[in-house]
Amino acid sequence: MALVSQARSLGKYFLLLDNLLVVLGFFIVFPLISIRFVDQLGWAAVLVGLALGLRQLVQQGLGIFGGAIADRFGAKPMIVTGMLMRAAGFALMAMADEPWILWLACALSGLGGTLFDPPRTALVIKLTRPHERGRFYSLLMMQDSAGAVIGALIGSWLLQYDFHFVCWTGAVIFILAAGWNVWLLPAYRISTVRAPMKEGLMRVLRDRRFVTYVLTLTGYYMLSVQVMLMLPIVVNEIAGSPAAVKWMYAIEAALSLTLLYPIARWSEKRFRLEQRLMFGLLIMTLSLFPVGLITHLQTLFMFICFFYMGSIIAEPARETLSASLADSRARGSYMGFSRLGLALGGALGYTGGGWMYDTGRTLEMPELPWFLLGVIGLITLVGLYWQFNQRRIESAMLSGS
């Protein structure tokens, strides 16, 4: 037992460092895409939104297949291959001077994520015990926030010189992450049984409770992805400089590093997981309604704070609930399918968000996209409330134990 505990402990430290590299490499590049191609090159927001949505759709929509392959062949080969593929996507993005090249680069980056994301998520479940899982997710999310602001700072600084430097730096970090996994990641099996890929896929698809939960989250993700598209654009518009975007991520980092873990510890003893998820989504929804009417940067940052607070409350509960509902015989497949809501919500949020933003500007109604996003958030809340009351989930799962 002592050896098992030691292996779990070392594995969690490995996951934390690995996650830092992945987050840093991602946020050096992706928050700058909308600024580079919309603000600097003058492309239509819908074209850039389509590229970002394509990355999301490919990565998360095909995640169930990446997870099923990892269930069959193990985590390590999928993680290493996926990271190298993302590095190649970033290198191609540096050469994007036409929309189709950007779309191809984002698709390649998303395909890499399809391969490495589900097995990495399944490893978290494998290496953490149920009672500590929610807190470990909180630590990962705190790290995500810190990595996001550091990555955005580095990316913004590099963008002053050339967008090529932004992309190449992100690619190098993913190559380093791949090497880290080659060197130190053991050949873990992420599921309790090694079954054919089809069996894992069918096990997920027959689980109506899990499928309903995942698809309901589509609206939640439509809101959450706007930190990568419309929020950076509106911050840049009001501030008059892309340098202000880094402060948006600084706010997220400050709130996450100071509040995420304490809130998770406090709330897990007092509220059920679905209550935390819905309350966080409500705060996110209400904070988006007035954004289109704001003309001062300080006021905008205040509502962005509210949005991040909602995310801080909702995200650990959402991730823990997804892990609790996963069948240990097909962890990779379940974690891959759990990203389908993110795939649909991301594709709709990016593409639809870009279209709504362009339409709002054309009609001289800047509040239009934010009002529609708020309505989507309210509809999602109703869907979650119905699901959790019509399809009761075991209390042990919902309490996070």
Swiss-Prot record:
The chain crosses the membrane at residues 13-33, 34-54, 99-116, 139-159, 165-185, 214-234, 243-263, 277-297, 299-319, 340-360, 368-388. The keyword Ion transport does not apply. One of its GO terms (cellular component) is plasma membrane. The lineage of its organism: Bacteria, Pseudomonadati, Pseudomonadota, Gammaproteobacteria, Enterobacterales. It is found in: Cell inner membrane. It comes from Yersinia enterocolitica serotype O:8 / biotype 1B (strain NCTC 13174 / 8081). PROSITE patterns: MFS. Keywords: Cell inner membrane, Cell membrane, Membrane, Transmembrane, Transmembrane helix, Transport. Belongs to the major facilitator superfamily. DHA1 family. MdtH (TC 2.A.1.2.21) subfamily. This is Multidrug resistance protein MdtH. SUPFAM superfamilies: MFS general substrate transporter. One of its GO terms (molecular function) is transmembrane transporter activity. InterPro entries: MFS, MFS_dom, MFS_trans_sf, MFS_Transporters, Multidrug-R_MdtH. Its main location: membrane. It is a multi-pass membrane protein.
